C-alpha cells in the first residue's frame, strides 16, 4: 500500500506559525510521526509540501498513477481552490482531507471547504493525529476498493 501525504501552503511554517492554533510540532516532526505509524503497518508513504497551487495539482494527478490513496491538508486552499477541487475530483483513488485545527470552530470564512464534497472524507481538529486518522481511513478505503 502506498499513500501520498500532501501538505499545502504555510504548513512548512508549523512550529512557528500560531502554535496556539496549529500546535508546536514542526512539519518534519509530524512527518516523522507519520513515517513511524506507517512503517509499523507496512505502508509506504511519500511526502510533499508546497505553497503553490499548481504543484499540488501536479502531485494529485501523478498520485492517480502511482498511489493507492492521498491524505491531503490543503491549508488555506481548502476554502477557495477550484483547481484543487477539480484535481481531487479527477482522480480515482481515495483522498482524505485533513486539518490540524477544527476549521468549523474557527473564523466563519474557514467553515466552508470546496474540497470536502469531492474528497472521500474530512478529518479536522485532532492536531497531528488528524494525519494518522486520515491514513487509517485512506488505508481502509483503498483496501476495500481492492476487494
UniProtKB/Swiss-Prot annotation:
It is an enzyme of class 4 (lyase). GO terms for biological process: amino acid biosynthetic process; aromatic amino acid family biosynthetic process; chorismate biosynthetic process; quinate catabolic process. It holds the Pfam family DHquinase_II. InterPro entries: DHquinase_II (IPR001874), DHquinase_II_CS (IPR018509), DHquinase_II_sf (IPR036441). The record marks 17 as: Transition state stabilizer. The keyword NAD does not apply. The active site is at residues 22, 99. Pathway: Metabolic intermediate biosynthesis; chorismate biosynthesis; chorismate from D-erythrose 4-phosphate and phosphoenolpyruvate: step 3/7. It catalyses: 3-dehydroquinate = 3-dehydroshikimate + H2O. HAMAP family: AroQ. Catalyzes a trans-dehydration via an enolate intermediate. This is 3-dehydroquinate dehydratase. The lineage of its organism: Bacteria, Bacillati, Bacillota, Clostridia, Eubacteriales. The gene is aroQ.
